[in-house]
């Protein structure tokens, strides 16, 4: 009887210690869990817009990865390092400045556009700290994130 209680207590301790790591999250096969979200690294480079569309199609509520803590960043960087070598990876942050509500001074709607600047999107590196921006049209690997 005492042995059964000891084993049951041991299993409870293991379960509770794993519950914060994503082991108890309901993530699809191939996805990894952390803090109520599921993550997956994709190794086929895409533009920022194509990567975001791809993430939305993968799972309900899916988007390019967003970071809300250094711990989450560390988790994703470790996940990436298990899948890819040093890479540039898109994240879900962008500055699409030319999509503001522009209009001509005579009141006409802006239909023709000839912007000289590009939109810039944010990426992170699996080996370097910090975020950087580059043209959204360039290709990069990416990580999708969705609610668990």
From Swiss-Prot:
Location relative to the cell: Secreted
Tissue-specificity statement: Expressed by the venom gland.
Domain C-type lectin positions: 34-145
Transmembrane spans: none
SUPFAM superfamilies: C-type lectin-like
GO molecular function: toxin activity
Note: Shows greater sequence similarity to the beta than alpha subunits compared to other heterodimer snaclecs.
Protein name in the entry: Snaclec B4
Taxonomic path: Eukaryota, Metazoa, Chordata, Craniata, Vertebrata
